[in-house]
């Protein structure tokens, strides 16, 4: 069970160091440049009985072969967000939460601790996005979709991808697929260090991919955690539902000057 944590908004004055309770479990943060330190800027530990909608928006609309629905989003009362994939009549429902209009942020260290789905037919993701991704002409500097992870497979592979210059004929992308033994068992952390110069991706605190592809995005993005149904992940009609994707926490750290 995670310790409760008072959220400090990005626009608020920072709390004195002594007033900040410890996070449990603690994150393994990357080593910082000399004279710099990590500072927690935003987080959700998913304590309580229902989703904190001062932090999250819950979209509801058709997405690929299913519908994003509030019916698929809940908390388990044990400090975890539950994102369900289920059948509702003749429709399939799954889940998305996002910080659109609540947290739109550039740079820093983004980390989520999750337990992945058990069934085929749908894929889970932790990603950064904004409408600026649709801009064309300045490569990814004016907007990049950053997929910290996508998981369409039930094996050790993890998809990490960048998309820029919109989604039409000018669309460009670059990705990497590391193998992470045991990733389908228990909880794991997926994270990104996004600096003005490069992206560094991690799984369980270990670097998996370092890249500058597309020209590093300089625009604020918001967080999305989602589940989608489509052929990429297999045939949803052949699996046993409901299935669950659990999120233990999401945290964002800023790199600041040491005092």
What are these regions (language model features)?
Residues 4-14:
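Bacterial N-terminal signal peptides
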Residues 15-19:
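Mature, extracytoplasmic segments of signal peptide-bearing proteins
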Residues 20-259:
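GH16 jelly-roll
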């Amino acid at each position: 069970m995670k310790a409760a944590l008072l959220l400090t908004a990005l626009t608020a004055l920072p709390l004195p160091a002594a007033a900040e309770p410890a996070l449990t479990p603690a994150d393994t943060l990357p080593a910082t440049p000399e004279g710099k330190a990590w500072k927690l800027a935003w987080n959700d530990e998913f304590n309580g009985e229902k989703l904190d909608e001062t932090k999250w928006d819950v979209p509801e609309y058709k997405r690929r072969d299913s519908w994003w629905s509030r019916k698929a989003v809940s908390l388990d009362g044990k400090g975890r967000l539950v994102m369900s994939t289920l059948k509702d009549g003749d429709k399939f429902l799954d889940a998305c939460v996002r910080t659109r209009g609540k947290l739109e942020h550039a740079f820093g260290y983004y980390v989520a601790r999750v337990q992945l789905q058990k069934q085929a037919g749908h894929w889970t993701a932790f990603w950064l996005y904004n409408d600026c991704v649709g801009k064309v002409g300045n490569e990814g500097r004016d907007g990049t979709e950053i997929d910290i992870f996508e998981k369409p497979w039930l094996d050790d592979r993890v998809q990490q991808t960048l998309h820029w210059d919109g989604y039409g004929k000018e669309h460009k992308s670059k990705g990497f697929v590391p193998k992470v033994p045991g990733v389908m068992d228990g909880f794991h952390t997926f994270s990104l260090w996004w600096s003005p110069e490069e992206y560094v991706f991690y799984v369980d605190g270990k670097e998996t991919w370092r890249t500058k592809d597309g020209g590093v995005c300089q625009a604020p993005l918001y967080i999305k955690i989602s589940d989608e149904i489509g052929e990429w992940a297999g045939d949803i009609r052949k699996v046993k539902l409901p299935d669950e994707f659990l999120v233990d926490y999401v945290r964002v750290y800023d790199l600041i000057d040491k005092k």
